[in-house]
Structure formats: structure tokens, C-alpha cells
Amino acid sequence: MYYSSGNYEAFARPVKPEGVEHKSAYLVGSGLAALTAACYLVRDGQMPGRNIHILEKEPIAGGACDGWHYEGLGYVMRGGREMDNHFEVMWDLFRSIPSIETEGVSVLDEYYWLNKRDPNYSLMRATVNRGEDAHTDGKFGLSDQGAMEIMKLFFTPDEALYDKPITDVFSSAVLESNFWLYWRTMFAFENWHSALEMKLYLKRFIHHVGGLPDFTALRFTRYNQYESMILPMLKYLEAHGVQFHFNTRVVDVEFDLRPGRKQASRLVLLRDGAEEHIDLTENDLVFLTPGGCVENSALGSQDSPAPFRPELKPGGGWDMWRRIAARDPAFGRPDKFCSQPELSNWMSATVTTLDDKIPPYVQRICQRDPFSGKVVTGGIVTARDSNWLLSWTFNRQPQFRDQPRGQLVGWIYGLFS
């Protein structure tokens, strides 16, 4: 959807690109970004689905937008997306993706109606003393100095923020405020993280600021995001004949590099453990998602903790990005993002209640019936005095279509792990 002056151009269908039926696309990974690109290739690019190839190293699509019932582990969600009105690309796409719940409507219709009928807001943003109200009371707690520090960061040139941590630009006037409690737990920021990243988040989500204390700016799906978002996209792509190649790991991309030219020439991949090559031409498009946020994740269980593995997994997205970047500086600097995992990792857990012991505590804190099928916590609840700076949430229940009646499935994460 293209916005210019008014909406004259917004709803017109693109002209079919000349020769598109002779082109092919290879998408490395099957997370939300790759699936979105594939959907746009089908809808707007009008590329035949049989010419679109999604190469995924796992046996299932979705990337970080997961939600799965693992034998012996139970329900697992590694994270969740907090969505708002200004996800323009996503909403433009989902108006064209048919619902898998209701015939004749789109995913966007379904999502919009749900959040109109059951708007999101939190009645308890933070607690202390094991469940008592922390009385953030919708306030930011910022002094004039703190507000000026945030404003100064917003207008600082990017180049002046290279290699600077947040503690170089914010004093205790910000770092001890409610604003920072809201922000850091919502976006998983540590004090030592990048000041430039903080600035970029401020610019991208400035419209969130008014809704930070109670999450009124946010929207959530009915079920976990694999079932509510990824599955409808998969059904749409499969219906158009898009080719999915699971258990297929792209380990390298070779390039034809000359002055004024950078063209992918070959994909090197492992399919079920055997090496293969795909030679590329000028009629082939390649879409990469290097450096995924769950690329190096590891699962624990009821009996053992999730192992911390500081080394990058060989043959993964980060490893591939490093190989590509070594060939040309224009391909970025991945080590800026992955060289200090002890400073960037965090731990999450999916919890399933099997009896009636925990739900009353959830209800007492969030002040809503968690079994109502409506908004429960309305976003994360942060235990302000937790050594982990632990936050937890229960979204609309059930979170999984096959979730047994009487159970709750929630998500917990510790910023300090």
C-alpha cells in the first residue's frame, strides 16, 4: 500500500512486472519477515508461487513467532510480539490473508474486531513484595532533567552515538524512573545496551509513549502468534503453490563482486545433511534474514535448565552473516550484535497451570478472571524488586487451540539472567 497525498494510490493494484513469470525467489528462513516477503511476491509482485522457494533449516516455519506443544516439554513460546496501529506493512498484508477461523473475512478483520470488542489495557503494571501494587500509578516519574536527557538523545546524530552505552546518555534521572522501568521491560533494554539502538527505538515507537504505563497502545492476537499469524500466512502461500524446503540449512551465499556490482551467484546449503548448490542468475531474487533473535536459543525442561551457549551455532543465520560480511564491508558488521552474548542474553519460560493453585493469584494481581477468554494481564506485569527484573503475562486464554479447559498458559522472562 503506497501513501501519497490522500489515498488515491493506496488501494490500486500494482501493474504486473514484465517477465515476472520467468523469475524465481529464494528466501532464507521462514520467520515473519521471510513469509511476509513471500506473500508480497505473490500478491503485489504476481510471481507464480511455484517460483518462490522458502529454505528453512527447522522442520517447521515461523522463526521467533512460535507456539508449539512439544512432547515431554509441554507448550513453548519463546516470546511474543506487542503490536500497534502503526505496523503498516503488516496490516496491509493481513487485509489480504484469509482467516483460518472465519470464512469470508481477513486476518486483519478478525484482529481488528477482536481488539475493538476487547481492548487491551493493564490494571497492574508492576508489583513489589511478592504481588503488592508497586503504585506506578500511570506516572513516568521523570524530572525535568530526565525529560531533557531523553529529548537530547532523540535529536543526537547517529554518528555521535556509535559504540556508546545507554549509561553515557542517561543519568539516574532517567534510569531510576518509572519511564525506564516501563521501557526497559517492554523492549528488553539493559543499561549497558547501545545508546544508538535506544534512540532508534524512541523514534520508531514514540507514539507508544503515552500508552507505556498501561499498555493501551498495544494490540494482541487471540491465540499465540504461530496459530494466529504464521498459520494463516502458510495456508495462503501453500494455496498459491509456494515451495517450502524444510530441514534445509543455507550455510553460505557466494557473490559476484565487482566495482558497482554485488550480485549473489550461488547458495550453498545442506539438505538433510547433504551439501547442495543452487546457481543463481540475474532472474533470481534472494532474500536473507541474517542474525535472527532466536537463532542461538536453547530449550530447557522441567528437570534441566536451558544451557547458555555463547558460541554461535555453525551453519546458522549469524554464521552465514559473518561469512558474507567478511567478503565486503557493505554487508554490515554482525559482530556488533553477537560478540558479547553474556551482555545481551535473557531467559524466558512458558508456564502451564495444571490445577487451581496459581489462577487465583493471577486474578488477584491482574484484577480480571483469567478464564474469561478476554484480556487478562493486558501485557507484562513486572516484579520491580526481583533480582531478575522478572516480568510475566497471561494473554487471552486459551493461548492454544488444543489447550485443555481449566489450564492457563503464560509467559515469563528475566531481563537479568
Label the predicted regions.
Residues 208-220, 283-285, 290-417:
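C-terminal segments that line or cap access tunnels to active or ligand-binding sites in enzymes
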Residues 72-113:
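Conserved FAD-binding subdomain of flavin-dependent enzymes
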Residues 64-67, 197, 297-302:
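Short, solvent-exposed loop/turn and secondary-structure capping segments
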Residues 100-207, 219-220:
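Rossmann-like flavin
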Residues 203-285, 290-291, 303, 310-315:
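Helical element adjacent to the flavin cofactor pocket in flavoenzyme catalytic cores
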Residues 42-69:
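Glycine-rich FAD pyrophosphate-binding loop
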Residues 1-25, 43-51:
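Extreme N-terminal leader/targeting segments of oxidoreductases
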Residues 29-32:
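Glycine-rich Rossmann-fold phosphate-binding loop(s) that bind the pyrophosphate
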